[in-house]
Amino acid sequence: MQRRQDAPLRCCVILLLVISAVIGCNRRRAATPPIQPVPTSVPLLPEVAILFSNGYAAMAADLRAALPRTAYKVTSVDVDVDESRRIIPTLRQKSKLVVVAIGLPAARVARDRFNGPVIFSQVFNYQELLVSGRSIRGVSAMPPLDLQVKEWKKLDPKIQRIGLIVAEPHSELIAQAEKAGKASSVAVIHEISSSDRETLYLFKRMTPQIDGLWLVPDDQILSPAVLRDLLSYARSHGVRVCVFNDALLEWGALMSATPTSADTTRTVRRLLEGLSNGATTAPNMTTVSELVIRLNVDVAGHFGLPSPTRAAWVVRSVR
């Protein structure tokens, strides 16, 4: 009888022991520290400073838009604005910064204030920027000469002799122009100048020998006053002039040949990607592969040239 009375008690004791064991097991599990995730390092994006001077804000904006935010950390600096320049000391402290400079004033700031790699564009007189021992590379401000003369010949089939006047530091352009002219059956008559007034004198002296003139964007041997006199004299003496700036069309030039902003941007980006990947074999100067031809229709009519179907068109090199 006693055993029957103790049976419920034993059942309760066993149940309590089971519950205690389960609770204890859960406590031991809770006490086990959680597995910590293995930290992963986030790679730092290459830092780029885009320096630009007056007149190149749009090109700087185009370049910034062309650099993916997922690939580069970009800072833009207008070197002509004091408030914008204040960030330069901070940028100088970044050891792996790459500077892209647009225009000569910006390129000079990049050369003088930074020690790292520099890529410049929109600079014709670039020789002063190529500091020995520095990684400084540029994108040529002159579009391919062979493309220029081919388009000129299409527009003006009768052109046979083109004049070219350059300063001594750009004498290498003479051989390039002669090669480009030969491919289109055009002779190049060349002179070396040391000043703007000498350029005008040399041009007037060569006028009887030429029917076209190739102007290069060299402010060492050209000035606004000389450009006006030269273009006026050219028109009155039957010389068609190809210029480097669209604004000079209004002064009487026949046509302008300029690099496209899009191609210059692509070329700068390609050089930048090479630097970011450790490339060290790029040449000091890289030539663009695309140019835009703009025509002064009134001047074309004055010289009796065939009526063009368009006043502007883009030409690309075949690589």
Task: Tell where the protein language model's regions lie, with residue ranges.
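Bacterial N-terminal signal peptides that target proteins for export
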Residues: 2-12
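Short hydrophobic alpha-helices and adjacent helix-cap/hinge residues
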Residues: 25-319
